[in-house]
C-alpha cells in the first residue's frame, strides 16, 4: 500500500477500506464466477488531494479487488472515521470530478464495514490481469497519469515527421527546422 502525506487516521482509514473488501472477497464474492483468483484486495496510492477546478478536498487512490479495479474518492471525515462530511455523495447518485484535464463520473456507495465512499470503475471483471503485479502496475500508471501536471508536456509518441521533399532529395531536415 503506497501512502503519501498521511497521518495515522488516514492510514487506518485506507487499511479499514482494504479490510472491508477482504471480508467481502471472503464472503459475498467467494463463489462468484467473475472473481479472478490470481488477484487479491489491495488499496494503492491513496493521497490527500483536491480535484482540479476548485473541487473539494478528499483522498484518492485505487482499490484493486479480484473482481474490479476502481478509482476511489474518500470524502473528508471528522476525527478518525467520525462524522461524515457534507460532501459525501448519496448511494447510487453520480457526480463528475476533474483530475488534470480529465472528467470522471463517480458513483456514491457505502459498505456496512467501512462507510461511504465514491468509485469510478476502471476495470471489471479483472480477467485481463494474469497476476497481482500486472494489476498493480496498471493502477500505478493510472495514478501517475492522473497526478501529472496538466501543463506538463506529453512524451513524444513517435519520431518527428520528416519533410517529404527532403527525403526524396536526400536532405535530412525535419519538418519545422530551418535549413
Curated annotation (Swiss-Prot):
Domain of life: Bacteria
Pfam families the record matches: NiFe-hyd_HybE
Lineage of producing organism: Bacteria, Pseudomonadati, Pseudomonadota, Betaproteobacteria, Burkholderiales
NCBIfam families, per the entry: hydrog_HybE
Annotated keywords: Plasmid
Transmembrane residue ranges: none
Cited Gene3D superfamilies: [NiFe]-hydrogenase assembly chaperone, HybE
Identification of the protein by name: Protein HoxT
Amino acid at each position: 500500500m503506497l501512502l503519501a502525506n498521511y497521518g495515522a487516521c488516514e492510514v487506518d482509514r485506507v487499511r479499514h477500506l482494504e479490510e472491508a473488501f477482504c471480508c467481502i472477497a471472503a464472503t459475498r464474492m467467494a463463489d462468484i464466477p467473475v472473481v479472478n483468483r490470481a488477484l487479491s484486495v489491495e488499496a494503492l496510492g491513496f493521497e490527500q488531494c483536491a480535484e482540479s477546478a476548485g473541487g473539494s478536498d478528499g483522498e484518492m487512490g485505487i482499490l484493486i479487488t479480484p473482481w474490479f479495479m476502481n478509482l476511489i474518492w474518500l470524502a473528508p471525515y471528522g476525527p478518525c472515521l467520525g462524522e461524515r462530511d457534507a460532501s459525501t455523495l448519496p448511494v447510487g447518485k453520480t457526480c463528475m470530478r476533474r483530475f488534470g484535464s480529465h472528467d470522471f463520473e463517480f458513483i456514491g456507495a457505502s459498505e456496512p464495514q467501512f462507510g461511504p465512499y465514491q468509485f469510478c470503475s476502471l476495470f471489471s471483471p479483472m480477467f485481463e490481469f494474469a497476476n497481482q503485479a500486472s494489476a498493480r502496475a496498471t493502477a500505478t500508471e493510472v495514478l501517475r497519469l492522473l497526478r501529472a501536471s496538466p501543463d506538463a508536456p506529453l512524451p513524444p509518441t513517435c519520431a518527428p515527421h520528416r519533410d517529404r521533399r527532403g527525403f526524396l532529395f536526400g536532405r535530412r531536415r525535419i519538418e519545422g527546422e530551418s535549413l
